[in-house]
Amino acid sequence: MEETLMHNFQPIIGIEVHVVINSKTKMFSPSANSHRSDPNINVHPIDLGLPGTMPEPNGFVVKKALVLAKALNMQNVDHHLRFDRKNYFYQDLPKGYQITQQHHPIATNGYLDISNKRVPIQRFHIEEDTAKQLNEDNHILLDYNRAGSPLIEIVTDPVFDSGKEVKEYLTNLRRILIFNDISDAKLEEGSMRVDVNVSIRPMGAPNYGTRVEIKNINSINNVEKAINFEISRQQELLLSNKKVVQATMRYDDQLNQTVFMREKTNAIDYRYMFEPNIIGINLDQQFLSEVDQIQVFNIKELESKLLSEGVDQQFVELLLDNFFLYQKINEINQRINDLAFVSKWLLIEFMGRINKQKLQLELINPKWFDNLTDLLVLVKSEDLNQKQAKVVLDEIIKTDETVAEIVDRLKMKQIKDEQEIIALLEPIVLENLAILKDYDQRKERVEKLLIGLLMKKTNGQANPNVSIKVLTDLIQKHR
C-alpha cells in the first residue's frame, strides 16, 4: 500500500525554525533573557509596550545573526538594519504588535547541505518572542518572561520530500546553532521550535496541494514521525476522494499521529509597517570586523576531521550532538594526542558510568575530567592496563582522590623496570623448567602459563610487554 502511495503522490515539505538566541538580555530591552526564572519576573516596560518606552536593538544578537549568516552560506546580508511592526491582537502580545523584519530580513539566499541535496534557505530574520501561554483548569496563564526574547526565524524553500530529509536538515542546523553558540537549540524547552508545512500532489502535477501546518513538536525524531504520518493521512484522504482541509495540526506522541487544532482560512492581514521607534541602523566597519574575528565552526569539516583521526562514526555523531563533550574530548586530547583512544574512554567508559548514575553532565565535578586525563596518560604509557584503568575510573567517581592516590592505595603501579622483572620472573622459570621442553610446539601456552604466574605474584603489576620480552630471553637462557 505505502509503495503504491509513494508512486502516486509527491510530498512537498517546507520548514520554518524559530531559535532563541543565547543572549543575557532581551531583543529590545535590558530585561534578563531567561526561561528558567519564576513566571513574570523578567519583564520590562519595553516588553509590555508601555507609553513612553523606546526599544533599543540588542547588538549582541545582531552579531550572532551575522555569524549564522556565515554558517548558513547566506549570499545576501543586509548591513542596514531595519525593523517592521507585525500588528495583531492576542493575549500573548500585550503591546498589540511584534517587532520583526518582514520587509528587510537580515540575510537571504543561503543553503545547508544534507546527504542527498542542497537545501535552499530563503531567508532568516530577527524578531522578538511573545509571552508563553499555558492552559490550565479552563484558564489561560501567561508568562511574560519570554515576551521580547530574541528570536531568529529561518525559512527554507519547500524542497523536502520525506521526514528523513527534514530530520537530517534539523540535526545539521541544530549542530550549527550549538557549536557556534547562537542558541542552545533545545526543542524540549522551546529554544528551538519547528513549524512544518506539508502538502502532497499527484506525481507530475504542476500545482501544490493543500498545505497543512504542524506545530508544537518537541523533538527532531517526532518531527520525522509527524511528517510521515501527515503524508500518509493526506494520501489516504485523496485516494478516498476526500479533500485535504487547510489546517493547523499538532503532533501527539502518545497516539503517534497529528491532531487537528484549528482550520486555516484566508491569510491574516498583519498590516506590516515600518517600526517608527527604531531608525535604520548602518552596521559600521568596526562592528563588522568584530564579527569577522569570531570563529565559525563548519560542522562538515569537524565531522571529516574526527573521522580522519580514527573516531568511530557512532562516536562522531554523539560528539556533534553534544558541544560540551566535543570540548572535553579536545581538552583531554591535548595531553593524549589520540582522538580515537580518548573517544572510546570518554564516551563508553566515562559516560557509561555517568549515565548509570543518572548524573547531569554539565553539573558533574570538573575534577573528574582532569582525573580522566591523568588516567589515560597512564594507560597510554602502559603504566596501567585496561582492566586496572576501569577500576581506577570507578574510584574517580566514588572518591575525591587523585589518580596517583588511587593507584597507590590499590597498589596498581606497574613494574616496568627490566631488572626488577628479571628478579621476579627468573625464579618462576627455574621452578617450571619441565614445561620448557614443550615451548617449540606450544609457545603461546607456555608463555601464558609463566606470565600468569608472574601476574599472580605481582598482583597484576608487572608490565605485560616488558614481561614477555624478559620471558623470551629467560627461556632462551634456560632451555
From Swiss-Prot:
- EC number per UniProt: 6.3.5.-
Keyword tags: ATP-binding, Ligase, Nucleotide-binding, Protein biosynthesis
Quickly give the catalysed reaction. L-glutamyl-tRNA(Gln) + L-glutamine + ATP + H2O = L-glutaminyl-tRNA(Gln) + L-glutamate + ADP + phosphate + H(+); L-aspartyl-tRNA(Asn) + L-glutamine + ATP + H2O = L-asparaginyl-tRNA(Asn) + L-glutamate + ADP + phosphate + 2 H(+)
Coiled coil: which residue ranges? none
What is one GO biological process annotated to this record? translation
Annotated signal sequence is: none
Q: Which SUPFAM superfamilies match?
A: GatB/YqeY motif (SSF89095), Glutamine synthetase/guanido kinase (SSF55931)
Keyword check for Metal-binding: no
Pfam families cross-referenced by the UniProt entry: GatB_N, GatB_Yqey
What is a GO molecular function of this protein? asparaginyl-tRNA synthase (glutamine-hydrolyzing) activity
User: Which SMART domains does the UniProt record give?
Assistant: GatB_Yqey (SM00845)
User: What is the annotated quaternary arrangement, including any partners?
Assistant: Heterotrimer of A, B and C subunits.
What the entry lists under NCBIfam families is as follows:
gatB (TIGR00133), PRK05477.1-2 (NF004012)
Q: Summarize the protein's role.
A: Allows the formation of correctly charged Asn-tRNA(Asn) or Gln-tRNA(Gln) through the transamidation of misacylated Asp-tRNA(Asn) or Glu-tRNA(Gln) in organisms which lack either or both of asparaginyl-tRNA or glutaminyl-tRNA synthetases. The reaction takes place in the presence of glutamine and ATP through an activated phospho-Asp-tRNA(Asn) or phospho-Glu-tRNA(Gln).
Q: Which family does it belong to?
A: Belongs to the GatB/GatE family. GatB subfamily.
Name of the protein in question: Aspartyl/glutamyl-tRNA(Asn/Gln) amidotransferase subunit B
